[in-house]
UniProtKB/Swiss-Prot annotation:
Part of the 50S ribosomal subunit. Binds the 23S rRNA. NCBIfam families: L31, PRK00019.1, PRK00528.1. This is Large ribosomal subunit protein bL31. Zn(2+) binds at residues 16, 18, 36, 39. It comes from the Bacteria. Its cofactor is Zn(2+). Keywords: Metal-binding, Ribonucleoprotein, Ribosomal protein, RNA-binding, rRNA-binding, Zinc. GO terms for cellular component: ribonucleoprotein complex; ribosome. It holds the Pfam family Ribosomal_L31. Belongs to the bacterial ribosomal protein bL31 family. Type A subfamily. It comes from Thermodesulfovibrio yellowstonii (strain ATCC 51303 / DSM 11347 / YP87). PROSITE patterns: RIBOSOMAL_L31.
Length: 66
C-alpha cells in the first residue's frame, strides 16, 4: 500500500439530537445525527412523525382540504 494517501481513521464521537452519545470509528472527530437507535420509532415502538425543516407542515398546507 502507498504511504500517506489513506485518510486517518480514528475514534469518533456520535452525538444525537436526543442527547445520546456513542463512539465509533470515522475520519471525522464528531458526527451529529438527528435520530439514533435510542429515539428512532422502529426501535422504541412509539409512533412519531419526524419533521425535517417543516416538510409535514408544508405538505399539510398544500394538500389539506379547505
Amino acid at each position: 500500500m502507498k504511504e500517506k494517501i489513506h485518510p486517518e481513521y480514528k475514534e469518533a464521537k456520535v452525538v444525537c439530537a436526543c442527547g445520546e452519545t456513542f463512539v465509533t470509528r470515522s475520519t471525522k472527530p464528531v458526527i451529529k445525527v438527528d435520530i439514533c437507535s435510542k429515539c428512532h420509532p422502529f426501535y422504541t415502538g412509539k409512533q412519531k412523525i419526524v419533521d425535517t425543516e417543516g416538510r409535514v407542515e408544508k405538505f399539510m398546507k398544500k394538500y389539506s382540504k379547505k
